[in-house]
Amino acid sequence: MPALLAGLLAGSAAPCLAAEPVELALRKPAYESRIVLDLSKRQITLLRGEQQLGAWPVAIGDPKTPTPKGEFAILNKRVNPIYVTHKSGQRRELRGPSSPIGDRYMAFHRNGRGEFGIHGTAWPHWVQIRAAVSLGCVRMLNSHIRQLFDAVDVGTRLEIRS
């Protein structure tokens, strides 16, 4: 080892050190969590293995702006995300449980126009009746999104199906 260090410090070529190959096994946890969103039931479910940890009603995308279907993963998680509106003609930033996206947000898909996420809402009625009213995001009651948010990590798989 001193010869290797001396060679590196002197800028000369040092002999290679032979070592036994090490095989690293990257294993997924035996009971990996995943989220399943059933658009027909308008229900989101958290599973660990085959065990259901929670199921909650949701509001989904309007037929003109549907929630995308497919396999996704949680891209990022935000507490007290900022919602920006220009409805009054001026830029206003809203945040917290009474903002249109509540106080928890989890992105799962990006396209050229923005991001799709699972988030809270200022309008619990739409979630309670499981409405199709959003621009493609998934709305949950604020108390429910907090439970789901705390139970999953960035990278958690999300399946959205009909």
Question: PLM features: residue spans?
Answer:
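Exported/periplasmic cell-wall-interacting domains
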Residues: L24-L26, A30, I82, S88-S162
